Amino acid sequence: MSDNDKPKLGMRAPLGLKRTVETGQVKQSFSHGRSNTVVVEVKRRRIVPGRPGEAEPQVTEETAAAPVAPAPAPAPAAQAPVAPRPAPAPIPTGRPMTPLERREQQERLLREAEEARMAALEETRRREERAKAEATEEERRRAEENRRAEEEAERAAAAAAAAATAEAETAAAAPREEAPAAAGTAEEAPRTSSSTMPPPRRFTPVPSPKRPEPPRPQQRDRKGDDRRQSGKLTVTRALDDDSGARARSLAALKRAREKDKRAHQAGTVQQKQVRDVAVPETITVGELANRMAERGADLVKALFKMGMPVTVNQSIDQDTAELLVTEFGHNIKRVSDSDVDLITSDDVDAAETLQPRPPVVTIMGHVDHGKTSLLDALRGTDVASGEAGGITQHIGAYQVQVKSGAKITFLDTPGHEAFSEMRARGANITDIVVIVVAGDDGLRPQTIEAISHTRAAGVPMIIAINKMDKPGSNAQRVREALLQHDVQVESMGGDVQEVEVSALKKTGLDELIEKIELQAELLELKANPDRPAEGTVVEATLDKGRGAVATILVGRGTLKVGDIFVVGAESGKVRALIDDKGRNIKEAGPSLPVEILGLSGVPSAGDQLSVVENEARAREVAAYRAGVIHQKRTTAAPASLESMFSALREQKAQQYPVVVKADAQGSVEAIVGSLNKISTDLIQVRILHAGVGGITESDVSLAAASKAPIIGFNVRANAKAREIATRDGVALKYYDVIYDLLDEIRAAMAGQLGPEYLEHVVGRAEIREVFSAGKHGKAAGLLVLEGYIRQKLRARIMRDDVIIYNGSISSLRRFKDDVPEVRAGLECGITLEATTDIKPGDIVETFEVEERERTL
């Protein structure tokens, strides 16, 4: 374009007589993509004739920069050079502009600048739209070329492989001759030079020579530069001689294919997959969405339409979940949380699988009637001498082999009243109950309770009348006393067997064994040993070196080392089995008591043990049972908590907090039950924590927060716990006999309540006259009706049988003399402390207060 063809700047200005100032915009480009737009002006100046010898005046154009160039082409182009600045022209000497002309000129310049800016913006927008359209078209064209190239490459490779198989002799020369033809058919557009294209790869056994890396393309304009490494060999580059052209990546090809696939499937309706959704009693919205394979937002939206504003983390009930499942077209399958638990009541063994098993015999009776001594005589051991206080405080399980070769399993239960739950548990897991009655003591409360437990369990009983070696023993008196409780022995025409024994002299033991074997034969005790084991926890402890240890009485099946089991809310794997003699065994059959190691925690006595198939199932069942226990505890808490706070508000009940630690779970139950029984309406025992094992630092910290003592039953505190207890002032109380424990706790609770005060009324008098007593206020003239009135006694005034004053007598006079005491039938005058509200006819009662030590 020549200089004459350049468009003039500011041609859109209106015509006028004034000199015009042509303006425009020039875009300056810098490195790193920076640019700047400059407004330029073109002024015409007239040069007046100068001195002689100077050139003729001529009109020149002075520009600051070149006008705005059109949009650059995609090909790289150099930046337009800036025109050289001419020499400065002399200042014109014409007349100066008036203010009106100057203002018009400024307005015109502003208008022209705005028009130029708008034109530049419009041009920029058109240029961007053009570039976008070209890029879209280029992308579509390249995708089409790549697709055709891939198809041609596949066809060429297949044809080359077929040709190589048919002509085996010329397999090496044929590819070089046919390479130009194959390359020519691979592309529809003409190529620049076929000799520069590398030969295509042939699928022949001959190894192809190493292909040289194509040269790096020249620097392109940023709009045309793909900014990718060009050393990667692709199918398109192998079949295309234009190695510098941009090639699409594999990810871009995959995206394009997915887009085409979605476009083809847009017209077809996909079939919704109907699922069977298992819905428990409560489920979160997010979990329900996962089971339905739906989006959680869709479920939340559906619930909002139902009027339930919830989030994906909130729980909904089973009925609401059913509405959602039905609305989304799925099938609901209602499940209950209890389905997770093990159900063994319906599991009945076939008759042909049953084999005889030893009987389980429980020894029950009153404390100190000789139960453990009798069992020691049967076993040939001496357990009773090693027990604290000479009383049994745990359930002991033993298996004895008698002279006939048969085996009998014995359970020794405590006789103290605090161990009622242990005796009831022993009666429920036994086959035969032997009730021991001392011949010199007769029937006692725990003996009667043992008879009741036996009847409730529905098991047969045998009466063993012990201590027959003592001079004062009378077996006939015991038999007659049993009749009062509907127990008729065989010697008196009944069906209950009885035997007279002496554990000390070991007499009558053989007869007792014979009666047990006879009763067991009548019961026909059988069990299936070839099945997963089931049993009952007799006792559970926490050993410092072995961890949680439970004594299990196997009911049916065979418990083996390595079995995975669930017991109550605990699970575990059998690491060791120890029998009653302390020997490690590999397996335990029916009716055999064993200690098991490997529990995750200490179970409760009486929990059922069941062997399961794997650890996941065991953890699932244990977690469900723990949740049930926690739910029961939390749901029962509000009522008791509310009643406790209401009692505290009314100052009716005090709290005596304690922390209980014992050596066995059964002992914990007995202690907690006994402490709750000694609570009264005035003071109640609050169990902060009750557990099995030694006293630890956490127990001391818990007790220190509530200023509570720690009760250790057959356990001790470690060194660190003792140090913290001394520092925080926590009382550590150790016991090994439950009698002493209950007596001391009862005394401590009574001491916290303080002494009780009893009132004894000693006199009654009637006020006959009221008169002034100077500084004492008012004095009352009395007639003593009953008893006596003494100075400094406590007194109360009653008016119409309502107490209106409670205080003490400050002075007592008869006539004008102070007297210490006035008896019935005499008159006197008194003044009372801090009251003047007395009238004739009121009754005065005097009483003494007796302080007495409180007992529970």
From Swiss-Prot:
Residues 412-415 are annotated as: G3. Residues 390-394 are annotated as: G2. Residues 156-196 have a biased composition (Low complexity). Residues 466-469 are annotated as: G4. Residues 22-38 have a biased composition (Polar residues). This is Translation initiation factor IF-2. Residues 365-372 are annotated as: G1. Residues 1-248, 254-273 are annotated as: Disordered. It comes from Rhizorhabdus wittichii (strain DSM 6014 / CCUG 31198 / JCM 15750 / NBRC 105917 / EY 4224 / RW1) (Sphingomonas wittichii). GTP binds at residues 365-372, 412-416, 466-469. Coiled coil: none annotated. Residues 356-526 form the tr-type G domain. Belongs to the TRAFAC class translation factor GTPase superfamily. Classic translation factor GTPase family. IF-2 subfamily. Residues 502-504 are annotated as: G5. Its main location: cytoplasm. GO terms for molecular function: GTP binding; GTPase activity; translation initiation factor activity. It is found in: Cytoplasm. HAMAP family: IF_2_B. The keyword Glycosyltransferase does not apply. Keywords: Cytoplasm, GTP-binding, Initiation factor, Nucleotide-binding, Protein biosynthesis. InterPro entries: EF-G-like_DII, IF2_assoc_dom_bac, IF2_II, IF2_N, P-loop_NTPase, Small_GTP-bd, T_Tr_GTP-bd_dom, TF_IF2_bacterial-like. One of its GO terms (cellular component) is cytosol. Residues 83-93, 197-209 have a biased composition (Pro residues). Gene3D superfamilies: P-loop containing nucleotide triphosphate hydrolases (3.40.50.300), Translation factors (2.40.30.10), Translation initiation factor IF- 2, domain 3 (3.40.50.10050). One of the essential components for the initiation of protein synthesis. Protects formylmethionyl-tRNA from spontaneous hydrolysis and promotes its binding to the 30S ribosomal subunits. Also involved in the hydrolysis of GTP during the formation of the 70S ribosomal complex. The keyword Glycosyltransferase does not apply. It holds the Pfam family EF-G_D2. The lineage of its organism: Bacteria, Pseudomonadati, Pseudomonadota, Alphaproteobacteria, Sphingomonadales.
